[in-house]
């Protein structure tokens, strides 16, 4: 699959250290190499969304939108578990999903 990153995702990824940075790079490689989203480990579809998913990376959550036409994963957010389901993030994700 193809992979794209938002500025917010890149900024959060650069702040990671140690095992989280390694885990994130492994997860991104997994995303690039799987044939479809259903094959990803630690990945779940977000309730109430059509093409938005989250991947668990330790105590962090990576949220992405899967664009079926281009077979592209657009990583939008990388946040700690405590912030992950904040209404602001989910509202913004919903807007981006709709285009």
PLM region descriptions:
Residues 11, 30, 80-83:
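Active-site micro-motifs of SAM-dependent methyltransferase domains
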Residues 29-54:
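A short, surface-exposed loop/turn module that caps and links secondary-structure elements
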Residues 16-17, 35, 88-89:
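Short, flexible helix/strand-to-coil boundary loops that buttress conserved ligand/catalytic motifs
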Residues 1-27:
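Arg/Lys-rich, positively charged N-terminal/basic patches that mediate binding to nucleic acids
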Residues 57-60, 65-99:
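Enriched for short, Lys/Arg-rich terminal
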